[in-house]
């Protein structure tokens, strides 16, 4: 939208990234708040932040006597046009975004409810329909594509989505990620779990490519049957096939990981998951969505203190009665004998 006067650069140092994250996400307070409401994907969290920011900008615009009746946000051209109209208005800071989100959304709201409450509050405040605030709206799709451009970089983005990035010139942050433990230590953990007789599966909110790149780099992919690695891509394909919303905190990703990514079975995973269960299941995760899914699946929950909250997440896991809590994912070997 070209609001403000800062220059956007593609390559940033780790220190610059940390500073931007602290500035825009209020030292992770906004991310933690969203995750506690089950908003777990990077794209949805970004959408919530930008929707709240647009809401406050449009309030300023309306207060100056301008009509909002012709506001449309469905394409990059619409975004640029709106940016020109909003030039000169103060962009809300992260503290204002946090206050606005918390004021619009009840404490007990789940993921889908978060955006329903936001939309209701925006429409009441601005006096217009706000279809752009919903998940999977055209504006959400623009955020998704922009996020993936930065995360994947030019080469992987074009390889994955079959089109050139809107703003080329990025190497991608995916290649700069580091694991939440030692890469070799995690691989040995996978090997030891298999030696003890456990079958391994993955259920992740990352896309197929986002999962494949680090797993190949650390050789973790060699420890998994690819049919038991369920990604956001698999969930998205199933959602479109069945006409249902299946992303976390819906347990579908866990069913697909545990039972196999077989599209011909997906409808039955949704309607009759118990028919596919065989033995006891353990879910290892660091978020509220993982806890909800473990309960829905009837699985044993092992909470790890490796998420945004770090050790402070212990209180959440205890309140939700997680079966086990460990400091690191590698500590699960002390539980799974």
Residue ranges with predicted function:
Residues 163-170, 174-187, 191, 201, ...:
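Substrate-recognition "cap/lid" segment bordering the active-site pocket of phosphatases
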Residues 29, 235-240, 244, 330-335:
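A short acidic, often aromatic-flanked loop/helix-cap motif at beta-alpha or helix-coil junctions
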Residues 209-212, 309-314, 334:
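Short, charged/polar "capping" segments at the starts of alpha-helices
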Residues 230-231, 323-332:
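Short acidic-hydrophobic, aromatic-tinged amphipathic segments that line or gate anion-handling sites
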Residues 205, 280-324:
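Acidic, Mg2+-coordinating phosphoryl-transfer loop and its flanking beta/alpha structural elements
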Residues 72-73, 82, 89, 97-138, ...:
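Substrate-recognition element of Asp-dependent hydrolases with the DxDx(T/V) motif
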Residues 126-165:
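Short, compositionally biased "basic patch" segments
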Residues 1-128:
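Conserved phosphoryl-transfer catalytic core
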